[in-house]
Swiss-Prot record:
Function: Is able to catalyze the hydrolysis of aryl-phospho-beta-D-glucosides such as 4-methylumbelliferyl-phospho-beta-D-glucopyranoside (MUG-P), phosphoarbutin and phosphosalicin. Is not essential for growth on arbutin and salicin as the sole carbon source.
Protein's recorded name: Aryl-phospho-beta-D-glucosidase BglC
Protein family: Belongs to the glycosyl hydrolase 1 family.
EC number(s) stated in the UniProt entry for this protein: 3.2.1.86
Entry-linked Pfam families: Glyco_hydro_1 (PF00232)
Induction data: Is not induced by aryl-beta-D-glucosides such as arbutin, salicin or 4-methylumbelliferyl-beta-D-glucopyranoside (MUG). Is not repressed by glucose.
Origin: domain of life: Bacteria
């Protein structure tokens, strides 16, 4: 559809930005915090770019008031952050660390004092190492109750001030890298374990939402899904079939479960034949049916194009984690699909396709299939930012964000109920696998892989651009 006069953004649209605890906080062992799996995993040689870790990160734990003041100067309407589970429960359960809760109390109150809506993510990958050691984390059903208890603790503490909540961040991406590529904890390659752990995470998500209804009845909650809408390489029927397979296995497998409480039938039957289907116990489907969210959180960075993959075809290919453009390799599942470079799209230095219209397509697909509001919980461009003459002229980021926001406006005109938009990220931060070289923020942080330097904050050109977008409610786009 072509709209001659696109609709404006809603009056109370949540113009925001986002972060994650491990990537910004630092203070990894201060004030009673316990270790997370990432505190341990990053110590394994070769697991991260130049051995980087989040021990200091960008020191948000000690500088949050400075960071929130910058958010207020920009005019942010919302800020999405995550709570570190082991900062609240050092051993994942049992004794509460009051100092951890107090930190998030202070952060939330600081945000609210500047009229910034807090958007709280319950789980952004920093599983307490104690639970990994005790029972294997999400490979055990024990985690369902432990996660629920942790969530209830936060609901009771912050539910009077926080309206918007995210349950699990990018479950699909995190578990894929944990159990398929071995690039995230626990660092194994086992598809059966992948689907079993993923099923348990679905149960934990549903249980957390069920409890949310009791403790924060006026709030809104949903998962954040790493959404890469699928395209076929061509109109050849075999490529169309590969595209359909990709949509089912990489998107609908999660979104159907989040929104409907059921697995898509065709991929489930395929997994049964392979011996990879998750174990479904009595009561599972009843619980999953109770986990319907209030919105679908979308973390959008790119679309992915697929073509036919023969039975002896491509499996796992190497992922570009260096920023050396052109080093990403094709990946796939033999007999199901394989990825292919889209000739119509440009890419970032990390070989991620730049496709603003793909965001609109994805928003429409979710709206038509699930009929739920959508909250863009991440979208942004990671690049090699350089300080020149005391500033960062990141016009490439402005172009990226503008083009995606223009498509958000088109999607709203199409009929998408879009709650808000959180860019990734507000400040520069630690990239899980790419160190500090891959910068996303509106605010430059003076540090790199070799040195923490002075961690000075510097507003980039994009800071002032987004400030104006917010001020005009998107009319300046």
């Amino acid at each position: 559809m072509i709209h001659q006069h696109p609709e404006s953004f809603p009056k109370h649209f949540l113009w925001g930005s986002a972060s994650a605890a491990y990537q910004i906080e630092g203070a990894w062992n201060e004030d009673g915090k316990g270790p997370s799996v990432w505190d341990v995993f990053t110590k394994i040689p070769g697991k991260t770019f130049k051995g980087t870790n989040g021990e200091i990160a960008v020191d948000h734990y000690h500088r949050f008031k400075e960071d929130v003041a910058l958010m207020a100067e920009m005019g942010l309407k919302a800020y999405r952050f995550s709570v570190s589970w082991p900062r609240v429960f050092p051993k994942g359960k049992g004794e509460i660390n009051e100092a951890g809760l107090a930190f998030y109390d202070s952060l939330i109150d600081e945000l609210l004092s500047h009229h910034i809506e807090p958007v709280l993510t319950l789980y952004h990958w920093d599983l307490p190492q104690a639970l990994m050691d005790e029972y294997g984390g999400f490979e055990s059903r024990n985690i369902i109750e432990d996660f629920n208890h942790y969530c209830i603790t936060l609901y009771k503490r912050f539910g009077d001030r926080v309206k918007y909540w995210v349950t699990l961040n990018e479950q699909n991406y995190n578990f894929n890298h944990g159990f398929i590529t071995a690039m995230h904890p626990p660092g194994v390659k086992d598809r059966k374990r992948f689907y079993e752990a993923n099923h348990i995470a679905f149960l934990a998500n549903a249980k957390a939402i069920e409890s949310f209804r009791e403790y924060v009845p006026e709030g809104k909650i949903g998962p954040s899904f790493a959404y890469s809408p699928a395209y076929p390489l061509s109109s050849h029927p075999e490529d169309i079939l590969a595209f359909e397979n990709a949509e089912e296995f990489t998107n609908n497998w999660w979104l159907d479960m989040y929104c409907w409480g059921t697995y898509p039938q065709i991929p489930f039957r395929c997994l049964e034949k392979q011996g990879w289907a998750p174990t479904i116990e009595a009561g599972d489907m009843d619980l999953l049916a109770k986990g319907k969210p209030d919105f679908v959180g979308v973390n959008y960075y790119q679309t992915i194009t697929y073509e036919r993959n023969p039975l002896d075809g491509v499996s796992e290919g190497k992922m570009n984690t260096t920023g050396q453009k052109g080093t990403n390799q094709e990946t796939g599942i033999p007999g199901v699909f394989k990825t292919k470079k889209n000739p119509h799209l440009t890419t970032s230095n990390w070989d991620w396709t730049i496709d603003p219209i793909g965001l609109r397509i994805g928003l429409r697909r979710i709206t038509s299939r699930y009929q739920l509001p959508v909250f863009i919980t991440e979208n942004g461009l990671g690049e090699f930012d350089k300080v020149e003459d005391g500033t960062v002229q990141d016009d490439y980021r402005i172009d990226y964000l503008r083009s995606h926001l223009e498509q958000c406006r088109q999607a709203i005109s199409d009929g998408v109920d879009l709650i808000g938009y959180c860019s990734w990220s507000f400040t520069d931060l630690l990239s899980w696998l790419n160190g500090y070289q891959k910068r996303y923020g509106f605010v430059y942080v003076n540090r790199d892989e070799e040195s923490t330097s002075d961690l000075k904050r510097l507003k980039k050109k994009s800071f002032y651009w987004y400030q104006d977008v917010i001020k005009t409610n998107g009319e300046s786009l």
